[in-house]
Amino acid sequence: MLLENGWLVDARHVPSPHHDCRPEDEKPTLLVVHNISLPPGEFGGPWIDALFTGTIDPDAHPFFAEIAHLALSADCLIRRDGEVVQYVPFDKRAWHAGVSMYQGRERCNDFSIGIELEGTDTTPYTDAQYEKLVAVTQTLIGRYPAIADNITGHSDIAPERKTDPGPAFDWSRFHAMLTTSSDKEIT
């Protein structure tokens, strides 16, 4: 995958207003894996894009009334079919982590990139999602090498608030695919 000005060239771009600048001289050193489905447990549809762009209709579903006021975004979403949607360029600070801490450092949004997988904690993720997550991760490691040793779940940086990506996310599979992909890049 190619990067241009912080954007994945092959992703669908849906710019979110919910971001700002990282602190001065701060580069991404952490990748946070999340999940999202809107309405909860349902896949497809325009609702994730609408949430991350601040345009979700609070009357379209009872749950949306609870979240319509939120100003949040992820850097990217990987849909069930493997489509990659990017909301925030990687050099900017997306608002995905909330109150969080990683290895003693607070405010993970300052130094992380957030990737949402369309899914739930208990619904197995698709092959296409793992493949695209590996491809995006490899691209990010190429640009921000420190990420290679710092990939975690939202539940690990905000354990009292969050459970995603949940037990359905196969970390062993992801790491094996990432290692295999890295080996192919080298040879």
From Swiss-Prot:
It is found in: Cytoplasm. It comes from the Bacteria. Zn(2+) is required for amidase activity. One of its GO terms (biological process) is cell wall organization. Zn(2+) binds at residues 34, 154, 164. It is an enzyme of class 3 (hydrolase). Pfam families: Amidase_2 (PF01510). Belongs to the N-acetylmuramoyl-L-alanine amidase 2 family. Involved in cell wall peptidoglycan recycling. Specifically cleaves the amide bond between the lactyl group of N-acetylmuramic acid and the alpha-amino group of the L-alanine in degradation products containing an anhydro N-acetylmuramyl moiety. This is 1,6-anhydro-N-acetylmuramyl-L-alanine amidase AmpD. It comes from Enterobacter cloacae. The gene is ampD.
